[in-house]
Amino acid sequence: MKRLTALLAAALICTGTVLATSADAEAVSCRRGYFCVWTHANFDGMKIEHSGDDHWWEGNMNNQDSSWANHGVSGPGVKDHVKIYDGRELTGDVTLCLAPGQEISYNGGANDKGGSHTWASRC
C-alpha cells in the first residue's frame, strides 16, 4: 500500500510539471521590452510591437485594438507602465493602463478605442 501511495504521489508531481510546461508554451507572443497590441481578442489578428512611445497609431491599428500585452522591462527610474489614449497625439481619455507584465485578452470598455500610447512611470 505504501508503494502504491508513493507511485501515485510521483505521478501527480510529474503531471503537475507537465501542466506547468504546457502553460508556458501558450504564453503570449510579445518580445521582452515591448508593448504589443492586437486587432482581435485573445491576442489574435494583426499584431504591432512597440519598444517606445507611438503618438500616432497607423490606420490599420487606430481604433482597431482588442488585446494588449506589456512586456516592458522594470527597474529604478524606468517607465514600465503603458498608457493607451483614445486619440492620436496622446489626446482624449486613457482607455487602458498596463502594469509591467500585464496582459489583457479583451476589455469591452477599451476595445477598438486606442489611437496612441506612451510609456509612463505609473498608471
Describe the predicted segments one by one.
Residues 2-9, 14-17, 21-123:
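Compact beta-sheet-dominated domain cores in extracellular/mature segments
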